[in-house]
Swiss-Prot record:
GO terms for cellular component: extracellular space. GO terms for molecular function: carbohydrate binding; growth factor activity. Concentration of this protein in the serum is 8-fold lower than in the E.quadrivirgata (another non-venomous snake) serum. This difference may reflect the difference in the food habits of these snakes. E.quadrivirgata preys upon snakes including the venomous snakes, whereas E.climacophora only preys upon small mammals and birds. Its main location: secreted. Homotrimer. Residues 1-19 form the signal peptide. Keywords: Disulfide bond, Lectin, Secreted, Signal. Coiled coil: none annotated. It comes from Elaphe climacophora (Japanese rat snake). Transmembrane segments: none annotated. Residues 62-163 form the C-type lectin domain. This is Phospholipase A2 inhibitor alpha-like protein. Gene3D superfamilies: Mannose-Binding Protein A, subunit A. Disulfide bonds join 83-162, 140-154.
Amino acid sequence: MQLILLSSLLLLGLSLANGHETDPEGQILNSLVETVSRLEKKIDKVENAFLTVHRARSFGSGSERLYVTNKQVGNFEAVRNTCVQAGGRIPSPQLLNENKAFASVLERHNKAAYLVVQNSAKFTNWAAGEPNNADGNKLCVKADAQGAWHSASCDEDLLVVCEFSFI
């Protein structure tokens, strides 16, 4: 919407610069400027409301990331696709407080979920004896209901949990 208004202002300016007085008293231009100003104020309000909600949601965990489930289950590929379509990704906790926030979702539903472990991760939460891919079939990682990490088959149907990072 703002782009359309700015384009209109540009076209009007070009028209006036070329000597075509389509708005001799500047009413259209003034109206467009007022509309853009109102839209900017509304955008500021939406941004502030969004940040307030985000801060409230992350207040308890101290995490800047939000972990959400749709209560469905799926294998790794299905979970990844679901998260990407929702604008998120499979969780990848980088800090203890992020893992706690992620684990709180799992604990609430008493289920495990996939996560992605970064090769350069400074934080890990492997359960005792993990990672363990002795049979060669555990190429994914899951977190149990308490947030401990385990090697897992990518074909397991686990709780869909997606990570969203807004800041």
